[in-house]
Amino acid sequence: MLTFMASDSEEEVCDERTSLMSAESPTPRSCQDGRQGLEDGESAAQWRSQESEEDHEEEDPDRYVCSGVPGRPPGLEEELTLKYGAKHVIMLFVPVTLCMIVVVATIKSVRFYTEKNGQLIYTPFSEDTPSVGQRLLNSVLNTLIMISVIVTMTIFLVVLYKYRCYKFIHGWLIMSSLMLLFLFTYIYLGEVLKTYNVAMDYPTLFLTVWNFGAVGMVCIHWKGPLVLQQAYLIMISALMALVFIKYLPEWSAWVILGAISVYDLVAVLCPKGPLRMLVETAQERNEPIFPALIYSSAMVWTVGMAKLDPSSQGALQLPYDPEMEEDSYDSFGEPSYPDVFEPPLPGYPGEELEEEEERGVKLGLGDFIFYSVLVGKAAATGSGDWNTTLACFVAILIGLCLTLLLLAVFKKALPALPISITFGLIFYFSTDNLVRPFMDTLASHQLYI
Amino acid sequence: MTLCAVESQLASGETARPGQAFFWLVSLLFSSLIWFTTATLIGNKDEPREKYLLIFGVLISVLIQEMFRFAYYKLLKKASEGLKTINPYEKAPSMRLLAYVSGLGFGIMSGVFSFVNTLSDSLGPGTVGIHGDPPQFFLYSAFMTLVITLLHVFWGIVFFDGCEKKKWYTLLVVLLSHLLVSALTLISPHYGLNLVLAYIIMVLMGVWAFFVSGGSCRSLKLCLLCQDKDFLLFNQRAR
């Protein structure tokens, strides 16, 4: 990442990035600057303060370089790997938490998203059946249909990517983000205004939605301050998750969550899995995977970069699923490249290696969406109980921690969904059925444990 | 390598708090599982039996919580040792810091679980105590939650210190005081007595934790009079 910061013109740096980052100039102190350059605004401040303390401890300028670079002592590599783990965990906690907070707050206050108003065409079987067996069967069938749609979409995307139909893909992404940013925002805003009984006239509404959507399109697909881009990505993930929570019937939602994690595991780890192929193709071509659709906590600009090296893809890259971004209704794609991976270290020689730095972490938007769906569903159907929601929230965060840890150890694409969703599901069902009666009984007798 | 990575993440203070919160959650899960299975096995639901069952549940829960605190201590210890073997020059987070953070994690999780449902109910319509129950229900819950959270923090510090210095009686004292505080809540209609005793226990534990983490009367005085060189205000005044 530092590589292209250094090579590129300073003015672009000043325009696009946060002021904190643009203030950094690529001085010969490569490691320090790079480290600062690559992190987002908040952590850059931390690095600044730590810099003075760390000055005397660093003899090795490559200390924070991505591990695996040839020529580095193995102990150093391990240490770097471990350093990555803890820091990146925190950098991802915040956006995931924010997304979940938005979803839970909306679910708890706006009735619209918990009312049943029909289902998506991907889940045609209704769950209003008299018998439990029939309901279970219907939800399994719904899941099969949904997963097959997802698989088809992913394979379609991989095929398009392989045959370099970039225009088609970009057009698709733009259409879907248009829909999310304008249509869903309009609906969301309408429902929120209805809930709080606030009147808004159409011209104001038009102006608000237009500004929001236009700035979002620019930030996500072109250039904009990192923080704003992150905020927009969080918002569109939340909107998408809300749509799922509204339109997926109950049992189908849980079965789909389980099935998606299994699919994710398979798609990312199997040698012929579509996500893995996508990631590998992107790495071979040295291109970042649709940067507009991955949440990254550090700069991922590729503007002006004549030749991208894989190091610019980020140390811990969690590719997402671009299709997720695609609209929910017609081209629902695969939930996520909930992949987490580190690109193979650059075989690029020389000075560029020296400047590699700790990059930010990237997590696919599909992961955000499914985490929020789980927590939102827990909030919507957990008998109005906050304990269940909190338990799912903690479980997902711990799963994310563990996944990042595994990422730091294995250094390749890893699915981010399975561990978190498994923990989340276990905790949802056990908290709802076991812990809730216990805590309720305790609370009614006013006992504290 | 994997184990070292696990350990280092835990050893870094940042992830210790959600880690401990997770452990508390798991301990709660186990204790409710035990309570639930016992309740199902015993069967009939007459009032005194339910109350005894609940008391049993509370005791088991306290025991399991302390067990999980110990388990977390062991995990953190292994993590710091692993980190030290990988890199002997790096300053690992001190055990005291980890003790504080983990106690905080426990406390926050415990407090939130006890109180959040009450909070959300308090937003709705209703009159507290209309059927003859004490009207200070919400205040009592709030203060009790506060004292439990602070107690968990202090217990965490004292507990970890006892484990580090192999003073096993410390663990016993923590366990007994936790049982005492929980048992006190059983006399629930007498809010005043309950709260006062709990706060007294908290102050005692707080003082103990203060001395255990290296404070002393002298350092307290220096701090309060802003003469402590390490303390922030000292630098302010020097200007």
From Swiss-Prot, chain A:
The keyword Transport does not apply. GO terms for biological process: amyloid-beta formation; calcium ion homeostasis; intracellular signal transduction; membrane protein ectodomain proteolysis; mitochondrion-endoplasmic reticulum membrane tethering; Notch signaling pathway; protein processing; regulation of calcium import into the mitochondrion. Residues 1-71 are annotated as: Disordered. It is found in: Endoplasmic reticulum membrane; Golgi apparatus membrane. The chain crosses the membrane at residues 89-109, 140-160, 168-188, 202-222, 225-245, 251-271, 363-383, 390-410. A motif (PAL) lies at residues 415-417. It is a multi-pass membrane protein. Its main location: endoplasmic reticulum. Residues 52-61 have a biased composition (Acidic residues). One of its GO terms (cellular component) is centrosome. Residues 1-88, 161-167, 223-224, 272-362, 411-414, 436-449 are cytoplasmic. Phosphorylated on serine residues. Probable catalytic subunit of the gamma-secretase complex, an endoprotease complex that catalyzes the intramembrane cleavage of integral membrane proteins such as Notch receptors and APP (amyloid-beta precursor protein). Requires the other members of the gamma-secretase complex to have a protease activity. May play a role in intracellular signaling and gene expression or in linking chromatin to the nuclear membrane. May function in the cytoplasmic partitioning of proteins. Homodimer. Component of the gamma-secretase complex, a complex composed of a presenilin homodimer (PSEN1 or PSEN2), nicastrin (NCSTN), APH1 (APH1A or APH1B) and PEN2. Such minimal complex is sufficient for secretase activity, although other components may exist. Interacts with DOCK3. Interacts with HERPUD1, FLNA and FLNB. Belongs to the peptidase A22A family. The PAL motif is required for normal active site conformation. This is Presenilin-2. The gene is PSEN2.
